[in-house]
From Swiss-Prot:
Pfam families: UPF0227. It comes from the Bacteria. InterPro entries: AB_hydrolase_fold, UPF0227, UPF0227/Esterase_YqiA. Gene3D superfamilies: alpha/beta hydrolase (3.40.50.1820). This is UPF0227 protein YcfP. Coiled coil: none annotated. Belongs to the UPF0227 family.
Length: 180
């Protein structure tokens, strides 16, 4: 089972495309939708939905995957639910760059301070990070600096922030998923 979390643009047709691409790894891909506008409610909702899926799950090696803001959530929810994560261009600093787009961006900073201390150290090697060198929305170098001490970073030379084509990475993701 692969759980897919969309980014800020929840209505993007790219979400459906990514789900279809992920089905080459595992036919059981589940899109979990969330508001993107209310961080504390989103976190509660995502934890509840992912936990429900895991309770009914028969896959011994589930995976959670997210793009952009979905990557922010996939890393955290995956850690809290003890499943591996794959994140594409994760928005690691939404409290800085979501100003004016969501109701309370400061809630992201609050979530970060309330999350498990040093969670990335405890999550070491359980997240695969794929970053685009041409991310027009986020500073991918800054993301790499924050994540490289803990996770493997794979660099993409072609995709933009929304990462429309993940197919070149499907074999890598599949291998990462099988590590369980």
């Amino acid at each position: 089972m692969i759980i897919y979390l969309h980014g800020f643009d929840s209505n993007s047709p790219g979400n459906h495309e990514k789900v279809l691409q992920l089905q080459f790894i595992d036919p059981d891909v589940r899109l979990v939708s969330y508001s993107t506008r209310h961080p504390k409610h989103d976190m509660q909702h995502l934890l509840k939905e992912v936990d429900k899926m895991l309770q009914l799950n028969v896959d011994e090696r589930p995976l959670i995957c997210g793009v952009g803001l979905g990557g922010y959530w996939a890393e955290r929810i995956g850690f809290l639910c003890d499943i591996r994560q794959v994140v594409f261009n994760p928005n690691l600093f939404p409290y800085e760059n979501m100003e004016g787009k969501i109701d309370r961006p400061e809630e992201y900073a609050d979530i970060a301070t309330k999350c498990v201390t040093n969670f990335r150290e405890k999550n070491r090697d359980r997240c695969l990070v794929i970053l685009s060198r041409h991310d027009e929305a986020l500073d991918s170098q800054r993301s790499a600096q924050a994540l490289h001490p803990f996770y493997e970073i794979v660099w993409d030379e072609e995709q933009t922030h929304k990462f429309k084509n993940i197919s070149p990475y499907l074999q890598r993701i599949k291998a990462f998923k099988t590590l369980g």
